[in-house]
Amino acid sequence: MMSRTPERDLTMKTSSILSLLCSAAAAALVAVSAASAAAAPEPYIPVISKGFQHQFWQAVKLGAEKAAVDFKVKITFEGPENESQVDKQLEMVQAALAKKPQALCLAALDSKAVVPLLRKAQASKIPVVGFDSGVDSDIPVATAATDNVAAAAFAADKLAQLIGGAGEVAAIIHDQTSRTGIDRGDGFVKQMKSKHPNVKVVDVQYGGGDQLKSTDLAKAIIQAHPNLKGFFGANEGSIIGVLNAVKELKKEGKIVVIGYDAGKQQKDAIRKGVEAGAVSQDPVGIGYKCVEAAAKAIKGEPVPKTIDTGFKWYDKANIDSAEMKPLLYD
């Protein structure tokens, strides 16, 4: 048996102390790491829409906020006062990028004008996700939107059917600069020309999504074309303008009206039979899917380039159905 010496006792004590110190240091490191992880800020994603005035955008906002909770990210949601303020939206994008976000969600008012700012985002390795309206660039890693060409073509088919396959029709489109405006206008007009040769599109005007301007434009069209049989409004503001014009000129029941999106005034008109029906998007789904794609892109996870959020036709027969209820906002 080895005899104990003062030197050996000292060595053993020193070893024990060092072992305890190492264990304490390791535990402290784990605790600090855990605290740091808990205190790490959530990734920030600014969500910039085309506007704030329509209930459509409020529904998109609800979806975006739900995704922010589910995917543990922080979002802000903003848009210009109306959908004609392209410069205002560009300022918002510039200000958002200056905050160095981890990603950006954008519904572009002008599919071309925003591209230089998106190049800056790309250079800063900030993934961009489009929603509702795409851009003329492959910079966005994904775009969550309705297939607006197909949806507007479907609206053209419905209108042609409801007027008996022949006659004069017109349309109010929200703009000719955003991807949604271009696609809905083209989808409607081209489908009517190619599939319904006996239906003539006599006028297409652009109201900026503004109800008052759209009302004035629709009234002018109706007065210029007394034989008008059908009218298409391509978004919430546009169709409300058409409904106002039809009412003011006492043409309710004489002109077949078809719309896009939802909102209380449009839903009431459909229930009363003043409006034949409308194409509904899934605004909550659009908001959710764009933030989901952005959150995944931040982590480097793959996301589909195009996220088709779908559309449905609704009229008096199915407006209160369980299938339509989640898609129709007030």
Briefly describe each language-model feature range.
Residues 1-2, 17, 30-32:
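Short hydrophobic transmembrane-like helices used for membrane targeting/insertion
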Residues 1, 25-27, 274:
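Long, low-complexity, tandem-repeat intrinsically disordered regions
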Residues 22-33:
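Bacterial N-terminal signal peptides
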Residues 4, 8-9, 13-16, 37-330:
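A residue-level marker of the well-folded mature domains of exported/periplasmic proteins
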